[in-house]
């Protein structure tokens, strides 16, 4: 990142003046309509992500910081649930729970990039990894590695997340995501 970009971050990092709607619209457009496989991955899981009866009030996707602004007109198919999970001091994660019939054009970023996740680990670098939290529902998570997923999808996810990195709230969220996934991996390893 250039020094100029760092200056911009310092100027626009005030949550009250950052236009998160435009930011997320841009991130959504970067990912576009790309999917993890060159074919319809919903065939593998009976479209569990977007047309499923596999819904209940506790399963959903974490919204990125301030992404709830994309749902000010709360569509019928999604419910936003505040959690007690803090990704940063005083900053709680909001869970988007759908009724199993999502509008793909309005789905959250976490849904658009699934089964991948972006994390920032202790070396302060963005990494794109398989989101093992989804292994119970997604055969891709269970059976594949990131390098086996469609390259254009991985590149677009990487580009979208790099675009979001200058915003401190989002960077903190990606750092916390790394912690969550590491905890999940540790628990999984205990039972393997």
Sequence positions of predicted segments:
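Short loop/turn segments that flank or connect secondary-structure elements
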Residues: 1-192
């Amino acid at each position: 990142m250039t020094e100029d970009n760092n200056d911009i971050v310092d100027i626009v990092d005030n949550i009250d003046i950052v236009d998160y709607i435009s930011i997320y619209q841009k991130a959504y457009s970067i990912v576009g309509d790309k999917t993890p496989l060159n074919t319809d991955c919903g065939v593998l899981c009976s479209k569990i992500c977007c047309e499923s009866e596999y819904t209940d009030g506790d399963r959903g996707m974490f919204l990125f910081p301030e992404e709830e602004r994309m749902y000010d007109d709360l569509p019928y198919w999604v419910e936003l649930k505040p959690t007690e999970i803090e990704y940063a001091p005083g900053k709680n994660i909001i869970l988007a729970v759908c009724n199993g019939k999502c509008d793909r054009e309005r789905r959250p970023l976490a849904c658009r990039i699934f089964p991948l996740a972006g994390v920032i680990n202790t070396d302060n670098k963005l990494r794109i990894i398989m989101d093992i939290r989804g292994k119970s529902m997604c055969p891709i998570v269970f059976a594949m590695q990131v390098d086996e997923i469609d390259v254009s999808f991985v590149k677009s996810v990487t580009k979208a997340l790099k675009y979001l990195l200058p915003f401190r709230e989002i960077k903190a969220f990606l750092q916390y995501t790394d912690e969550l996934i590491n905890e999940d991996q540790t628990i999984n390893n205990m039972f393997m």
